């Protein structure tokens, strides 16, 4: 591991800043900016590669930070001027470590691999055209919490590696397999070809059945739609059933991330009630 001091806002510092805010640069360089205890721990636990880590020069590192650096083995460790380090953080009190992690593409293969390894019926979590990185992060977090096999986004979507997504996911973006597909048609074709033949459940305020009226104990693909427009016509036509969540307040629907969490919980509840673990 190479160690360098950084006291000027030159090219290397600007790289941290740019990767934090610019999706195109993240995609081109295959690098993502991250900070936060849980995010760092999850990335290390799941064997992601660190291109760089940065700590504040002159600040005594905690045992946790020293342990994380030793486990991560970043290609380079920057000892950064304290004010510069603080400026990279969106937190009131900056995390000891900010980092650049190498992006990786899981593809459908890793989702298929996880499905074949699990004793539970697969749960494929689909988010159609998510616009908000925060909602995408919440979706990842909830899918992981309630036994999701993998996450698939379709169409033009928010960036998995946006710092807001990473933060909202509490690092589960590094734990659960995920992939992007350009169209609903491609995702539906893949789901229909799966040997376990999952029930494809879409969500809609105008669904034909309440969520809890559907048997969700077998293989399931759950599709959540865009925050404003809901599921695309292709998804609505391709689903086996459209489910609705009964709500009784003034709002006609839930936030996409909240709706997904309710759905994932109901799937988990039914499976636990049937003794599936």
Language model segments and positions:
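Structured adenosyl-cofactor binding patch, chiefly the S-adenosyl-L-methionine
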Residues: 99, 142-146, 160, 164-173, ...
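RNA substrate-binding interface of SAM-dependent RNA methyltransferases
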Residues: 45, 100, 105-207
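A glycine-rich helix N-cap at a beta->alpha junction
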Residues: 68-90, 179
């Amino acid at each position: 591991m190479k160690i360098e001091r950084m006291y000027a806002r030159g090219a290397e510092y600007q790289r941290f800043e740019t990767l934090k805010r610019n999706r195109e640069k993240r995609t081109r360089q295959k690098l993502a900016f991250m900070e936060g205890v849980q995010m760092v721990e999850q990335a290390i636990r799941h064997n992601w590669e660190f291109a760089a880590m940065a700590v504040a020069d002159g600040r005594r590192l905690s045992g946790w930070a020293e342990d994380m650096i030793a486990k991560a083995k970043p290609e380079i460790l920057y000892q950064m001027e304290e004010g510069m380090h603080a400026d990279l953080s969106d937190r009131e009190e900056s995390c000891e470590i900010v980092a650049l992690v190498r992006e990786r593409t899981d593809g459908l293969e890793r989702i298929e691999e996880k499905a074949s390894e699990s004793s539970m019926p697969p749960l494929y979590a689909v988010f159609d055209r998510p616009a908000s990185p925060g909602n995408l992060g919440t979706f990842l977090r909830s899918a992981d919490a309630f036994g999701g096999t993998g996450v698939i986004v379709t169409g033009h979507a928010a960036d998995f590696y946006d710092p807001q997504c990473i933060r909202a996911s509490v690092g589960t973006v590094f734990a659960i397999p995920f992939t992007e597909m350009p169209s609903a048609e491609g995702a539906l074709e893949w789901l229909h070809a799966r040997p376990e033949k999952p029930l494809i459940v879409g969500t809609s305020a105008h669904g034909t059945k309440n969520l809890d009226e559907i048997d969700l104990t077998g293989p399931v693909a759950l599709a959540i739609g865009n925050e404003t427009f809901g599921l695309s016509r292709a998804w609505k036509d391709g689903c086996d059933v459209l489910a609705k969540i009964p709500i009784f307040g003034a709002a006609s629907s839930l936030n996409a991330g909240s709706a997904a969490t309710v759905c994932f919980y109901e799937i988990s509840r039914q499976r636990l009630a049937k003794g599936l673990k």
